[in-house]
Amino acid sequence: MKTTYNFLFVIICLSLLACQTTPSDVLPRIAIAGLGIESSTFSPALTTEEAFHAQQGMEIMKDYPFLNPEHKNRSRAQWFPALRGKSLPGGIVTREAYESLMNIMLDQLKKNLPYDGLFFDIHGAMSVV
């Protein structure tokens, strides 16, 4: 639980530090990142990194119809997809999986700083052991 709060704190700080005022003729720079799972502490199963089917870079864009190349929203910003992973509902997430995915995500986010916004695609209730 403490790790989750630490991660959220880091993301919020990165977001705030990375924000800048942009002139109206410059497109906003928006990062995309997120993880999602419904994990149950009552399940004996452990959820590993592979279960998230993590995507990186432009591969992420295909999951958002409103960001397809022909959609008008695609040209309204500069998009910087970092990492996105979604898992089926399962057991507690292993610490190794969580830390690996978070490190990849944070490294990807740091590459293109500063941002004007973050599309933080999260869902569920994640427990990490």
Please report, for each region that a protein language model flagged, where it lies by residue:
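Positively charged n-region of N-terminal signal peptides that target proteins for export
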Residues: 1-6
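Bacterial N-terminal signal peptides
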Residues: 7-16
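N-terminal amphipathic/basic leader segments beginning at the initiator methionine
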Residues: 25-75
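Short, solvent-exposed loop/edge-beta patches enriched in aromatic
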Residues: 72-78, 111-116
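Low-complexity, highly charged intrinsically disordered N-terminal segments
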Residues: 77-80, 84-88, 97, 101-106
